[in-house]
Amino acid sequence: MKPEIHPEYHEITVVMTDGSSFKTRTTWGKPGDTMRLDIDPKSHPAWTGVQKLVDTGGQIAKFNKRFSNFGLK
């Protein structure tokens, strides 16, 4: 492999929706960062069979604001 063309590979902590956490190695973020999951295998509809609306960061509100002037009422 060519030297110095690959991203840095380091350890981070992943926190799942139920609060449990584990350490993994990745190229995401910086060494020691924490990744908090909004959806994981314990809460994803594909594995739980339960439908759930997830609006992270007001995405629906942002969409409605952006397209409110089209006037389809």
Swiss-Prot record:
One of its GO terms (molecular function) is structural constituent of ribosome. The keyword RNA-binding applies. It holds the Pfam family Ribosomal_L31. Keywords: Ribonucleoprotein, Ribosomal protein, RNA-binding, rRNA-binding. The keyword rRNA-binding applies. One of its GO terms (biological process) is translation. PROSITE patterns: RIBOSOMAL_L31. GO terms for cellular component: ribonucleoprotein complex; ribosome. Binds the 23S rRNA. Part of the 50S ribosomal subunit. Belongs to the bacterial ribosomal protein bL31 family. Type A subfamily. NCBIfam families: L31 (TIGR00105), PRK00528.1 (NF001809). This is Large ribosomal subunit protein bL31. It comes from Rhodospirillum centenum (strain ATCC 51521 / SW).
